[in-house]
């Protein structure tokens, strides 16, 4: 029934697995989640801009396979000749077997988290083609940040978790407030820069006075 429905991944899980990556649970280097899942696109990082552009493209009749130009997305292709000035990462076969190649690949990715200087990145999967990462989306303006956090979030977990007793960790963050995004640090234990980028984005002080009950 849904054979021709575009499948687009997002969120931190897909974002941090957008290229070849080490999986702690399986203790091995795995493919980009775009390869393993069979999805059409990844909207990585903070996706407010990219998901709107994807939706507008689909609404206008552009096939999902041709949506290869949106900042903040990852797509698959057998041809990188039409990608402007890409940086070719070590192939999956290389990073799977060579620790230095893995480190080199991650270092290149880390240096391309700034939307103003980042280049497209291409990772080869042999006869499966390439996984190509476009530069990150532009950061949100303060007004956009205010609008995002003024939405009517419920602060509740999905009902599917009720039979398991809920999500205990939610108690720690349920009443926390998001004041900013991004981090210019490079802490090796933290994925914040890799997910949200280096550019700090902040809410206005007045936005906190409009908090919903």
Roles of regions detected by a PLM:
Residues 190-203:
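Iron-sulfur (Fe-S) cluster-binding segments and ferredoxin-like electron-carrier domains
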Residues 139-144, 148-152, 167-170:
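Glycine-rich, aromatic-lined ligand/substrate-binding cores of catalytic
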Residues 164-191:
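N-terminal pre-triad scaffold of radical SAM enzymes
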Residues 26-31, 35, 43-44, 135, ...:
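Catalytic cores of nucleotide-enabled group-transfer and carboxylate-activating enzymes in metabolic
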Residues 14, 48-49, 153-155, 182-185, ...:
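Short, glycine-/Ser/Thr-/acidic-enriched flexible segments
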Residues 1-126, 133-134:
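Glycine-rich beta-alpha loop elements in corrinoid/cobalamin-binding modules
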Residues 209-213:
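Conserved small/polar residues in nucleotide/adenosyl-binding loops
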């Amino acid at each position: 029934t849904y054979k021709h429905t575009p499948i687009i991944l997002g969120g931190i899980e897909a974002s941090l697995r957008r290229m070849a990556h080490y999986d702690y649970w399986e203790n091995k280097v795995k493919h980009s989640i775009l390869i393993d899942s069979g999805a059409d696109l990844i909207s990585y990082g903070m996706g407010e801009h990219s998901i709107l552009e994807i939706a507008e493209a689909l609404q206008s009749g552009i096939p999902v396979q041709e949506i290869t130009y949106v900042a903040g997305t990852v797509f698959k292709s057998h041809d990188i000749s039409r990608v402007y000035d890409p940086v070719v990462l070590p192939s999956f076969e290389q990073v799977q077997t060579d620790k230095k190649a893995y480190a080199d690949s991650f270092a290149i990715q880390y240096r391309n988290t700034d939307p103003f200087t980042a280049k497209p990145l291409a990772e080869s999967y042999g006869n499966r083609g390439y996984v190509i990462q476009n530069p990150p989306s532009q950061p949100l303006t303060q007004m956009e940040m205010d609008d995002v956090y003024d939405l009517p979030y419920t602060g509740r977990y999905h009902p599917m978790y009720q039979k398991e007793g809920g999500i205990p960790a939610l108690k720690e963050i349920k009443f926390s407030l998001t004041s900013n995004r991004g981090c210019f640090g490079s802490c090796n234990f933290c994925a914040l820069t890799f997910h949200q980028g280096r550019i700090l984005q902040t809410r206005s002080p007045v936005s906190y006075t409009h908090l919903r009950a």
